[in-house]
Amino acid sequence: MTNIRKTHPLIKIINHSFIDLPAPSNISSWWNFGSLLGLCLMIQIMTGLFLAMHYTADTMTAFSSVTHICRDVNYGWLIRYMHANGASMFFICLFIHVGRGMYYGSYTFMETWNIGVLLLFTVMATAFMGYVLPWGQMSFWGATVITNLLSAIPYIGTTLVEWIWGGFSVDKATLTRFFAFHFILPFIITALVIVHLLFLHETGSNNPTGLNSDADKIPFHPYYTIKDLLGVLMLILFLMMLVLFFPDLLGDPDNYMPANPLNTPPHIKPEWYFLFAYAILRSIPNKLGGVLALIMSILILALLPFLHTSKQRSMMFRPITQALYWILVANLLVLTWIGGQPVEHPFIIIGQLASISYFSIILILMPISGIIEDKLLKWSL
């Protein structure tokens, strides 16, 4: 009798995706973050569902309802902080996952990569709208500043902003629709994740060498299920350490003050995972230019397949590009730091230089280094 997992219409799909899936024998721990992102998404959907049971999307009661969750609901504080810090873990895993794809040339799987970029945008939109829901000072002013950026769009800008607000300022209508979108988007993300995996399983996984691994495949289970389990345990350990010991480490103290349209906080800034993009936005003195730079800072990822000049797929054997890659990582850390600083000297010039470096490395220096390395390789043979 044939095994049920190979014959049953539904179980067969799971079998081909997670059990009998042929995987390269040499993929490293950098390949663990895909499954960790799946775990983060599940944690966020489950904790978010329980939070939504007690939350009220109304300007008068939103802040109080979050307080009520933390004080009166059984383990409400745990659910709330798991959701807030779970978002941070989500973005840490996302950045590593994207960074891995850049380093090892995974972007040559065009469909998988482009859906990944779309997923990144969707997750960022979801996180932004979620940050507005507690209706603290930073929630309100963050929403005001970021939605206001759309007014930079010529001709339709102002109308568009007021349409999104549902009025002449961020108010009840805005909060209600943000809650609706914040609730529905994770399910859209889940659907996109399935498509992401569907395209990935058409080609099979990449590996650190960037070479074809068809000749040396191993089954996903038990080898990578047990390897993923280690990653899962480490992620949960790290998340629970944050939640139970330092729940407010990554948050803004201003968000513990109820939203007040008459009182602007001294420094309006988003959550830490948006600071690099926020720094790029602020580094350009022109409003429309800043918005375009902000969008391009993420959309540039979609250009990577077209900017690849090397004959080698991975950076594993390309020391010049490797050096540029790690300079880019350091540059992103500088941008993250600058995004959290006030707009004054010397932070303005540092932010501008870091923004120029960011685009220069990806658009100019990396493609050039790919050509140079190919030449060096040709001469050495």
Swiss-Prot record:
One of its GO terms (cellular component) is respiratory chain complex III. A ubiquinone binds at H201. Keywords: Electron transport, Heme, Iron, Membrane, Metal-binding, Mitochondrion, Mitochondrion inner membrane, Respiratory chain, Transmembrane, Transmembrane helix, Transport, Ubiquinone. SUPFAM superfamilies: a domain/subunit of cytochrome bc1 complex (Ubiquinol-cytochrome c reductase), Transmembrane di-heme cytochromes. CDD domains: cytochrome_b_C, Cytochrome_b_N. Its main location: mitochondrion. Belongs to the cytochrome b family. This is Cytochrome b. It comes from Chrotomys sibuyanensis. The gene is MT-CYB.
